């Protein structure tokens, strides 16, 4: 019976596909005949053929028909009809652009219509609204902008286009910061895929790495500032919503493959189609790189190193990949995405920061030293209008396998063993060569969401909308393993007790409401969200997240004043790590360890004032944003554990402008930021930390010929300084303090004073401070179109500029030199 049912379903699907293919072939034949009529000057005949069959056209055929109908109307000097069909075309495809072969009148008409329209996004208020009405500063990155940037991953796209976002390198996985707030990994910015959270519930991490395909994206919507009033925890500094293409956008199959220096191999496959009311989009992407071997000048200290070679940009032994599917049928939508990423740290752990021999260390389930994540995300939603209220319900499921396997040292660390005196096996391990830390956990979470949207109109000058929603999520860590590797291949025994301590589950409840009301040119947008979280130890977190924005709209400009507060709870992994370390390093009971090692949520308050101008000069848009941020309870990695010791106050100015012409585009941004208050290692440094005071980007695109398109990206960063706790000085301070204590206990006063003086000197040097020079990087690229075949070439860091970056809990990390890639793509 089951086989018979499957056979019937398969037969029906096959028939539908054959019917769709038959209709497509018929419609394509009609269009080609009309196009032939147009080319020989029989414009009225071409117009009649298309008008008679337009209702039956779908996908790219319909778009081509609307374009040709507009051209026919122009040929007959019917500007009104030409404009009508051009608007219909842009309704079908808002990102359509005229080609060099199109008449100038048609190109000008399309650009004029597009200029009169403001792009819409859904991220800022969970409903479609124009950029002018968005309550917080927002950056919209289109598919064309992604191509023009030449970016290889999401990190590079965001750094190129989003003011205030910049790359940090914590010698960890791929990372990015917003307005100077960052961590070891990317856990302060909420990253979503079509509104579905990608950040881990265990670590809060969503790395903007090669595990997220760029080819599948239609646009990227970025909210610059706190957004917990809608999205709760993790949306501390910004929200990035990745919007995929739809099947109709692609209408076929696209394949792309590339190869470059340092062992780079990249491939992408996309499939998209719309069958009646069913829209289907499927994507797959993979990337591999052996990395660039370099010998940078690193700092010397008392700890040795086995090699001078550092490998930068290595993607482990297994390629990063991203596979997924999205299907829409009327109000029903399903999405599934799985991605894998594996990034190798160039240097050893923390501020030891030494080169190491990567291939000498053992593997765990095939995983070599790296930061490795494999995730699965599924989302099923249904949208329906009921009594003028638009309702949307969603079911979500997420599953991740997380591995942090980091080399500590290739030489004995007697100073490190002091911290584990209560665990002789681990203390002994640090007296051996080739030590590393291996942490692995498997998490899963599921949730249910319900959102509603009611729109009302009192009269032409009074209208608005009321949004509301509630959500429940459950997270659990099913497995946790913690090992110390020594002698490169040996490991300490796994502790069943520690593994059990690592396991746990947490529950999340939240509700929100948002009111948007417009009185003529004035819009008030106010929202509030309440989050209630039950932690693994039954403690509670209760957070209120308000937002209030005033927007004044004019045809050519707008003003925005907004306040918002956000929070992010301390990651489960950090809290459990503190507990495990406290249990290992002392003999206190677990309950006491939990209370002593508890971490509080981080929070941020932000006040922003924005002025934006639209089309003051044809094709030119600009924005100036002034912000004040105050962040408290920021979590700082303190060698091997975590503390709420960070506080940050900063002011800044963000400038954006874009100029779009038929054959030329330019996107520019500049950020100036000054930190008023900043604390590192319990000391006020009151300066930007790993954040340039001035950073700027210019991305240019030029349609040189019908087939050739060129693009350039210039990125400038002013001098910056890194401040971190120095583990070398921490070891020295601990060693001298212990020797002083021993001398004091034996009554050796003079010796005691000498050791205390050395301990004080080490303590004074506890904050590691180094400058990084200003840099200007240049990236170039080109695309050559031959029919449906596209040839591409991109080169990054054209002048092979040598530079270093840093981040949290590390020293200076060398960056990539000149990398290039050739690619070829074909659209079937």
Model-derived features with residue positions:
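Gram-negative outer-membrane beta-barrel transporters
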Residues: 518-524, 617-632, 643-729, 825-827
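Membrane-embedded beta-barrel scaffold of Gram-negative outer-membrane proteins
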Residues: 392-396, 402, 558-560, 597-649, ...
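Short acidic/polar hinge/loop motifs at secondary-structure boundaries
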Residues: 196-224
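Short strand-turn segments of transmembrane beta-barrel domains in outer membranes
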Residues: 239, 244-273, 284, 596, ...
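Extracytoplasmic beta-strand/coil segments of soluble accessory domains associated
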Residues: 123, 138, 155-196
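Face-selective signature of the C-terminal outer-membrane beta-barrel domain
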Residues: 328-342, 371-538, 623-624, 657-660, ...
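C-terminal beta-signal and adjacent terminal beta-strands/loops
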Residues: 719-723, 730-732, 753-758, 783-828
């Amino acid at each position: 019976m089951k086989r018979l049912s499957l056979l019937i379903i398969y037969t029906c699907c096959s028939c539908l596909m054959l019917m769709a293919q038959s209709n497509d072939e018929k419609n394509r034949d009609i269009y080609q005949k009309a196009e032939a009529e147009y080319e020989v000057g029989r414009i009225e005949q071409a117009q009649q053929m298309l008008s008679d069959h337009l209702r039956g056209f779908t996908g790219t055929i319909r778009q081509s028909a609307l374009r040709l109908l507009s051209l026919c109307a122009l040929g007959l000097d019917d500007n009104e009809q030409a404009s009508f069909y051009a608007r219909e075309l842009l309704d079908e495809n808002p990102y359509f652009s005229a080609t060099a072969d199109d008449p100038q009148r048609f190109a000008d008409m399309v650009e004029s219509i597009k200029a009169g329209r403001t792009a819409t996004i859904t991220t800022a208020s969970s409903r479609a609204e124009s950029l002018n009405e968005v309550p917080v500063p927002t950056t919209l990155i289109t598919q064309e902008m992604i191509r023009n940037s030449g970016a290889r991953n999401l990190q590079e796209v965001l750094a190129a286009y989003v003011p205030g976002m910049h790359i940090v390198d914590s010698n960890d996985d791929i990372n990015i910061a917003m307005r100077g707030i960052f961590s070891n990994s990317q856990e302060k910015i909420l990253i979503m895929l079509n509104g579905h959270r990608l950040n881990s519930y265990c670590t809060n991490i969503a790395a903007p790495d090669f595990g997220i395909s760029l080819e599948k994206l239609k646009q990227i919507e970025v909210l610059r500032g706190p957004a917990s009033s809608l999205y709760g925890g993790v949306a501390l500094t910004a929200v990035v919503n990745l919007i995929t293409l739809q099947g109709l956008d692609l209408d076929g199959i696209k394949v792309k493959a590339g190869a470059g220096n340092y062992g780079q191999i990249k491939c992408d496959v996309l499939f998209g189609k719309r069958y009646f009311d069913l829209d289907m989009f499927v994507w797959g992407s993979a990337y591999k790189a052996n990395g660039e071997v370099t010998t940078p000048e690193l700092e010397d200290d008392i700890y040795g190193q086995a090699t001078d070679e550092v490998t930068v940009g290595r993607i482990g032994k297994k390629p990063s990949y991203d596979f997924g599917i999205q299907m829409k049928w009327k109000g029903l939508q399903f999405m599934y995405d799985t991605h894998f990423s594996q990034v190798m740290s160039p240097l050893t752990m923390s501020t030891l920061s030494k080169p190491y021999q990567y291939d000498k260390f053992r593997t765990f389930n095939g995983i070599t030293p790296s930061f490795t994540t494999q995730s699965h995300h599924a989302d099923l939603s249904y949208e329906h209008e009921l009594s003028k209220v638009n309702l949307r319900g969603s079911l979500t499921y997420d599953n991740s396998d997380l591995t942090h396997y980091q080399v500590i040292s290739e030489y004995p660390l007697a100073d490190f063993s002091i911290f584990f005196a209560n665990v002789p096996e681990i203390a002994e391990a640090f007296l051996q060569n080739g030590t590393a830390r291996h942490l692995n956990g498997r998490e899963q979470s599921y949730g249910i969401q319900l959102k509603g949207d009611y729109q009302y109109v009192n009269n032409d000058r009074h209208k608005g909308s009321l949004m509301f929603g509630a959500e429940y999520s459950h997270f659990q860590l099913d497995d946790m393993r913690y090992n110390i590797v020594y002698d490169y291949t040996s490991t300490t025994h796994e502790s069943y007790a520690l593994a059990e301590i690592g396991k746990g589950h947490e529950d999340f409840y939240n509700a929100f409401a948002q009111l948007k009301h417009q009185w003529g040119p004035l819009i008030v947008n106010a929202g509030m969200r309440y989050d209630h979280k039950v932690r693994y130890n039954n403690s509670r977190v209760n957070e209120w997240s308000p937002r209030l924005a005033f927007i004044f709209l004019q045809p050519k400009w707008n003003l925005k004043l907004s306040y918002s507060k956000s929070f992010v709870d301390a990651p489960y992994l950090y809290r459990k790590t503190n507990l495990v370390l406290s249990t290992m390093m002392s003999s206190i009971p677990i309950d006491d360890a939990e209370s002593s090692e508890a971490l509080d949520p981080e929070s941020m308050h932000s006040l922003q004032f924005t002025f934006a101008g639209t089309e003051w000069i044809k094709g030119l848009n600009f924005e100036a944003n002034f912000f004040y941020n105050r962040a408290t309870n920021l979590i700082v990695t303190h060698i091997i554990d975590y503390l709420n010791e960070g506080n940050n106050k900063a002011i800044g100015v963000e400038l954006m402008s874009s100029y779009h012409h038929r054959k030329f585009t330019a996107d520019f941004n500049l950020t100036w930021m000054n930190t008023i208050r900043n604390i590192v290692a319990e000391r006020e440094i009151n300066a930007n930390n790993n954040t340039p005071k001035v950073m700027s980007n210019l991305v240019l695109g030029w349609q040189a010929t019908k087939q050739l398109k060129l693009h350039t990206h210039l990125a400038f960063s002013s001098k910056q300084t890194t401040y971190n706790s120095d583990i070398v000085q921490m070891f020295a301070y601990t060693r001298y303090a212990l020797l002083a204590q021993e001398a004091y206990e034996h009554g050796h006063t003079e010796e005691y004073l000498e050791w205390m003086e050395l301990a004080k000197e080490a303590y004074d040097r506890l904050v590691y401070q180094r400058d990084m020079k200003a840099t200007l990087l240049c990236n170039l690229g080109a695309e050559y179109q031959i029919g449906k075949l596209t040839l591409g070439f991109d080169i990054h860091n054209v002048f092979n500029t040598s530079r270093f970056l840093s981040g949290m809990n590390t020293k200076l990390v060398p960056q990539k030199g000149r990398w290039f890639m050739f690619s070829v793509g074909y659209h079937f």
